[in-house]
Amino acid sequence: MVAAPTSPAELKLGVDCVIADINLADFGRKELDIAETEMPGLMALREKYGSEKPLKGARIAGSLHMTIQTAVLIETLVELGAEVRWASCNIFSTQDHAAAAIAAKGIPVFAVKGETLEEYWDYTHSILEWGDGGSPNMILDDGGDATGLVMLGSKAEQDITVLDNPGNEEETFLFASIKKKLAQDPTFYSRTKAQIQGVTEETTTGVARLYKMQKSGELPFPAINVNDSVTKSKFDNLYGCRESLVDSIKRATDVMVAGKQALVIGYGDVGKGSAQSLRGLGATVCIAEVDPICALQAAMEGYRVVRLEDVVEDMDIFVTATGNYQVIRNEHLVKMKDEAIVCNIGHFDNEIDVASLKEYEWENIKPQVDHITLPSGNRIILLAEGRLVNLGCATGHPSFVMSNSFTNQVLAQIELFTKGDEYAKEVYVLPKHLDEMVARLHLGRIGANLTELSKDQADYINVPVEGPYKPDHYRY
């Protein structure tokens, strides 16, 4: 591993790392030290597995938001024996001091807050390129971009026409990046794919991509769906968004949320947390949903369930949380009231039709906050250019809830790296006993004391005294 650079001038793509400023490393380290006190799951795994080094020999290509919390994850993986190369999975989500702290430890990282799309795909390629000419053997993904890059590149080796018709700006840069790499190394992607033993996926959108590949028979390696671990989806997605959404809106706009009319589009775990977040500060919250079960849940929680087109002229705040495409379209945007706030807390930037807004007048207020003048003369406030608002305009989810998610990630990486031969080329979830273990590791930090079953009680409900306590189909 190449020594960490000592000045920004030494930060060259493909050498060791690309970060904004190595001088931020001390600041990043101080925040890392605080975060570790709030991440008991990861610290427990270091203590449990640190001497065993179960990830020795693992070469992990990581594509996940380069935050302080992710830095604790990275250092945990390294302490357990892995070699790691890291890029952010979003152009706005990097915390530059976190990236600097990781670079200062000599760990290759390629992430800058506000990087261009061209740079984004260059950096994602960099995590697949080991200095000795080798390849990663594991992928840790968030949104599926690293996995998708390997897969699409492999297809393009066989048929370059798959890159002929990009459907949006992101694909334009992705396709160009793949073409550039193929010109340099025509078999790069297939060689990389052949070395991958498994992938662990963090988020709903990336998991959907994996299941799509499994259904079509194209999944070339086993995958673990970390997102659907209960201690991820019911905590990170729900409680994380409950805190981070309003944090990002307040930091970006300084508006008073109380008294505002807010529409949350999508009432899954992320939408539930987002709705609670806005209601908690006094907003009147409505929900838009396509799923009758989620819609009924929202109604039973006291939210008014509406259609976007029926309320678009009345809402002060719009939040998309669907993981879907073109949810808020131009036909909705042009009808919005003056100073309406529009943001997205789903993984990708295509929930809001930002491309259609490019024809209007934009005024940048500050990073990731734009005023856009509509044909009506009204101006809307677009946050993070329609990308993840909680990481574009704030610092994402708190350390404690991310410890839940990242403890699952480490366990999933250990599982696939050490037992990969036992898994078929399918998508799996972590077993219930590991889910419960993750929860146990976090109880003490918040002063929670667990009641214990007696042997007779356990026998009565037909579960082991030590768990697992619920069947796999149980809905928490």
UniProtKB/Swiss-Prot annotation:
Pathway: Amino-acid biosynthesis; L-homocysteine biosynthesis; L-homocysteine from S-adenosyl-L-homocysteine: step 1/1. GO terms for molecular function: adenosylhomocysteinase activity. The keyword NAD applies. Its main location: cytoplasm. GO terms for cellular component: cytosol. Keywords: Cytoplasm, Hydrolase, NAD, One-carbon metabolism. Binds 1 NAD(+) per subunit. It comes from the Bacteria. PROSITE patterns: ADOHCYASE_1, ADOHCYASE_2. Substrate binds at T67, D142, E202, K232, D236. It is found in: Cytoplasm. Coiled coil: none annotated. Its cofactor is NAD(+). Its EC number is 3.13.2.1. It catalyses: S-adenosyl-L-homocysteine + H2O = L-homocysteine + adenosine. NAD(+) binds at residues 203-205, 237, 266-271, 289, 324, 345-347, 390. SMART domains: AdoHcyase (SM00996), AdoHcyase_NAD (SM00997). It holds the Pfam family AdoHcyase_NAD. SUPFAM superfamilies: Formate/glycerate dehydrogenase catalytic domain-like, NAD(P)-binding Rossmann-fold domains. One of its GO terms (biological process) is L-homocysteine biosynthetic process. InterPro entries: Adenosylhomocyst_ase-like_sf (IPR042172), Adenosylhomocysteinase-like (IPR000043), Ado_hCys_hydrolase_NAD-bd (IPR015878), NAD(P)-bd_dom_sf (IPR036291), S-Ado-L-homoCys_hydrolase_CS (IPR020082). May play a key role in the regulation of the intracellular concentration of adenosylhomocysteine. Belongs to the adenosylhomocysteinase family. This is Adenosylhomocysteinase. It comes from Synechococcus sp. (strain CC9605). The lineage of its organism: Bacteria, Bacillati, Cyanobacteriota, Cyanophyceae, Synechococcales.
